[in-house]
C-alpha cells in the first residue's frame, strides 16, 4: 500500500477532534436518514402528492437518504478509531457513493430550477414539456450524468483517497498531477459553478417576471376588477413556490461552497497551506446538506405536514389548525374557487358578482416545487402556469341574461340552491399541473380562434332555450352545412366574426375597442356589439380534438348538465377516472334535453384553446 497516498495513516490531532467530528456526523446521519425517510413515506402514502413536479422532490429525498445512510455510519466509525479502517476498496466505494449522491442532488436542483423557470416565464412551452414521462426522463438523465462523473476516478481519471483527518474519502484534489488537476477543474465547473450560474439566471428571470406581473396588475387598476383576485392569488402562489425551491437551493449551495473553495485552493497549488481541519470541516458541512430539506418541507409544505401527522401518530403536532370554510370552500388549495370576488358600491345599491377564478396555494411545485396536490374539497384543478393571465385584463361581460343572474343580494347568495348556485365544472386532471397562458405580447392566433369563453355556472336551462344557437342539434347541423370549419359554439348572441377582432388579442386597447361593433356573419343578421360575443365555448368535436392532441389530459362530459356534474364523487374525480355520462350519474328529470352537454369554465376554456391552437 502506498503510504504516501494516505491509507492507514493517522493525522496528528487531538483525540477529542475526532470525537467532535464523530458526534456531528452521527447527528447528520440520524437526522438525514429519518427526515428523508419521512419525506419518501409521505409521498408514498399520499397519492395526491405524486405529481410530476413532485417527482423531483422525491428524487432529491432519495439521493439525500442514500447520501446519509452510506456516508455517516462509515465516517462515524472511522472517527472513533481515528483512522480509515476499511481499506482501499472500501475507500473507493465510500467516495464513489458520496460523489454519486452529492452530484445527483446538485443536478437535481438544477432540474428543479429549470422546471420552475419554464412554468413561470414560458407557460405555453410548459404545457408541452411538463409531464410525468418527461419528468422521469429528466430524472434518469440526472442520474446518468452523475454516474459518469462518479465513475471517472475508478476508471483512471484521478483517484479516490482519504482526506481531512483520514477518516473520510474523496477524489484526489491534493496531488498535483495533470489528471487530478484536470478532473478537479472540470468537476467544479460542470457540477458546481455552471449549474449554479444557470440556477441564478433562472431565479433572476422568475423574480423579474413575478415583479413585472405585480406591477401590471397595479397599472391596470380597475380594468381587471373581476380577474384581479385570481391574478393576485396565482402570483402569490407562484412566488411562494419559487421561494420554497430557492430556499432549498440556497441551503444546498451554502453547504457545498466551502468544499468547492478548498478543492480550488488545492488545485491552484496551495494545498500545502490547507490544514487537516480545513479539509475535514468542509467535508462534514457538505454531507450535512442531506438533512436540511425535510425541515424546509415541515415548515413550508402544509400537505407534507398533514400527511405525516395523519400517518405518524407521534408527529400529530405538525397538523395545521382547521381553517374557516366559506360557502365555496375558497380556502382549499389547487381548486376552482367559486366565490364572491367583487363588490361594487353605488349610490343606489350593492351588487355581488360571481366569477369563476382559479386558485392555487402553497405546495409543491414543488412545483416542485409544485408541492401542492389536489385538495379533497370541491372540484379540483391544478394551475401552476398562470402568470400569463395578466395578458387578459379585459373585464368579461356576458349577455344580459347572464348579467341579470349575477346580481343578487348577499342573503340570497348564501341560500343559493343547486339550480341557482353551481360550482364551475372540472375540466382538467389535477395531476397535470398546468393552466397554460400566452406570453405578452400575445402570439398570433390561427383563424377561427376565439379568445373568450362563457362562465357556464350562470347559464340556466331557460337561457339555453332562449338562444337557439346553443342547441346541440343546431350546432351539429351547422357543422353539416357551409360552416364545417367552425370548431366552436356560441352561447350568446355573438358570432364567429368577432373572434378575430383586435380587442380579443390587444390588451392595451381592449376597453376602447370593445365599444366598436363587429361585421355581420352567417349566424347574425345584424351588427353585434363586441361585448355580446364574449361567450364562446368548445363544441364536443373541438373538445375531443384537443383531448386527442394533448394526450388525453382533459376530462370532457358530452352529456348531462351542471346538476350531473355536482353529483360526481370528489374522490372519483381526483383519481382522474373518466367522467361518466348522465345515465351513470342517476340524473333524473332535472336534466333538460337542451342542456345535454357540459363545458369548460370561463378562464380554463379560453386558455386551453389558445394553447392548443399555438401548438
UniProtKB/Swiss-Prot annotation:
InterPro entries xrefs: GPCR_opsins (IPR050125), GPCR_Rhodpsn (IPR000276), GPCR_Rhodpsn_7TM (IPR017452), Opsin (IPR001760), Retinal_BS (IPR027430)
In this UniProt entry, the residues modified to N6-(retinylidene)lysine are: 287
What residues form the membrane-spanning segments?
20-40, 57-77, 94-114, 137-157, 190-210, 245-265, 280-300
Cellular location(s): Cell membrane
The residue spans the entry assigns to the Cytoplasmic side of the membrane are as follows 41-56, 115-136, 211-244, 301-615
According to the UniProt entry, its GO molecular function terms are:
G protein-coupled receptor activity; photoreceptor activity
Any keyword RNA-binding?
Answer: no
Which PANTHER family does this chain map to? OPSIN
Protein name from the UniProt record: Melanopsin-B
Amino acid at each position: 500500500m502506498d503510504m504516501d497516498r494516505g491509507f492507514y495513516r493517522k493525522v496528528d490531532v487531538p483525540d477529542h477532534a475526532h470525537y467532535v467530528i464523530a458526534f456531528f456526523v452521527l447527528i447528520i446521519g440520524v437526522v438525514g436518514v429519518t427526515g428523508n425517510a419521512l419525506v419518501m413515506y409521505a409521498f408514498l402514502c399520499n397519492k395526491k402528492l405524486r405529481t410530476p413536479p413532485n417527482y423531483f422532490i422525491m428524487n432529491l429525498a432519495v439521493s439525500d437518504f442514500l447520501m446519509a445512510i452510506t456516508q455517516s455510519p462509515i465516517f462515524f466509525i472511522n472517527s472513533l478509531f481515528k483512522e480509515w479502517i476499511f481499506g482501499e476498496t472500501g475507500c473507493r466505494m465510500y467516495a464513489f457513493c458520496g460523489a454519486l449522491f452529492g452530484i445527483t442532488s446538485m443536478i437535481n436542483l438544477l432540474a428543479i430550477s429549470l422546471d420552475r423557470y419554464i412554468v413561470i416565464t414560458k407557460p405555453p412551452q410548459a404545457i408541452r414539456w411538463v409531464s410525468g414521462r418527461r419528468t422521469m426522463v429528466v430524472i434518469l438523465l440526472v442520474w446518468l450524468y452523475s454516474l459518469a462523473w462518479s465513475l471517472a476516478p475508478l476508471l483512471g481519471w484521478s483517484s479516490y483517497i482519504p482526506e481531512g483527518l483520514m477518516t473520510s474519502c474523496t477524489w484526489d484534489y491534493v496531488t498535483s498531477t495533470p489528471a487530478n488537476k484536470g478532473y478537479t477543474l472540470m468537476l467544479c465547473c460542470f457540477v458546481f459553478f455552471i449549474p449554479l450560474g444557470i440556477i441564478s439566471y433562472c431565479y433572476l428571470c422568475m423574480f423579474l417576471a413575478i415583479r413585472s406581473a405585480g406591477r401590471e396588475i397595479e397599472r391596470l387598476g380597475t380594468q381587471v376588477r373581476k380577474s384581479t383576485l385570481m391574478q393576485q392569488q396565482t402570483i402569490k402562489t407562484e412566488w411562494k413556490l419559487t421561494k420554497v425551491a430557492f430556499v432549498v437551493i440556497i441551503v444546498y449551495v451554502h453547504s457545498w461552497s466551502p468544499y468547492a473553495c478548498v478543492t480550488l485552493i488545492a488545485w491552484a497549488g496551495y494545498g500545502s497551506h490547507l490544514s487537516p481541519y480545513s479539509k475535514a470541516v468542509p467535508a462534514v458541512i457538505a454531507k450535512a446538506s442531506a438533512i436540511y430539506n425535510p425541515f424546509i418541507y415541515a415548515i413550508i409544505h402544509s400537505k407534507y405536514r398533514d400527511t405525516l401527522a395523519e400517518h405518524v401518530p407521534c408527529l400529530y403536532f405538525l397538523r395545521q389548525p382547521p381553517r374557516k370554510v366559506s360557502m365555496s370552500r375558497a380556502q382549499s388549495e389547487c381548486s376552482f374557487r367559486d366565490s364572491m370576488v367583487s363588490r361594487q358600491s353605488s349610490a343606489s345599491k350593492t351588487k355581488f358578482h360571481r366569477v369563476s377564478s382559479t386558485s392555487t396555494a402553497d405546495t409543491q411545485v414543488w412545483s416542485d416545487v409544485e408541492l401542492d396536490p389536489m385538495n379533497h374539497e370541491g372540484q379540483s384543478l391544478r394551475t401552476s402556469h398562470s402568470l400569463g393571465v395578466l395578458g387578459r385584463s379585459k373585464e368579461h361581460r356576458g349577455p344580459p341574461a347572464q348579467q341579470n343572474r349575477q346580481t343578487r343580494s348577499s342573503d340570497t347568495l348564501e341560500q343559493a340552491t343547486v339550480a341557482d348556485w353551481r360550482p364551475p365544472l372540472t375540466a382538467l386532471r389535477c395531476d397535470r399541473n398546468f393552466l397554460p397562458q400566452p406570453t405578452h405580447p400575445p402570439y398570433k392566433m390561427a383563424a377561427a380562434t376565439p379568445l373568450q369563453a362563457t362562465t357556464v355556472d350562470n347559464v340556466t336551462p331557460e337561457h339555453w332555450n332562449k338562444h337557439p344557437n346553443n342547441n346541440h342539434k343546431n350546432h351539429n347541423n351547422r357543422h353539416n352545412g357551409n360552416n364545417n370549419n367552425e370548431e366552436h359554439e356560441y352561447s350568446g348572441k355573438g358570432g364567429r366574426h368577432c373572434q378575430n377582432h383586435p380587442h380579443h388579442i390587444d390588451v392595451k386597447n381592449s376597453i376602447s375597442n370593445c365599444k366598436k361593433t363587429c361585421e355581420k356573419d352567417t349566424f347574425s343578421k345584424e351588427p353585434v356589439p363586441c361585448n355580446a360575443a364574449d361567450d364562446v365555448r368548445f363544441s364536443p368535436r373541438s373538445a375531443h380534438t384537443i383531448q386527442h392532441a394533448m394526450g388525453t389530459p382533459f376530462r370532457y362530459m358530452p352529456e348531462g348538465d351542471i346538476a350531473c356534474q355536482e353529483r360526481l364523487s370528489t374522490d372519483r374525480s381526483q383519481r382522474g377516472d373518466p367522467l361518466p355520462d348522465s345515465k351513470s350519474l342517476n340524473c333524473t328529470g332535472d336534466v333538460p334535453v337542451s342542456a345535454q352537454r357540459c363545458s369548460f369554465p370561463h378562464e380554463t376554456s379560453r386558455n386551453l384553446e389558445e394553447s392548443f391552437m399555438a401548438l
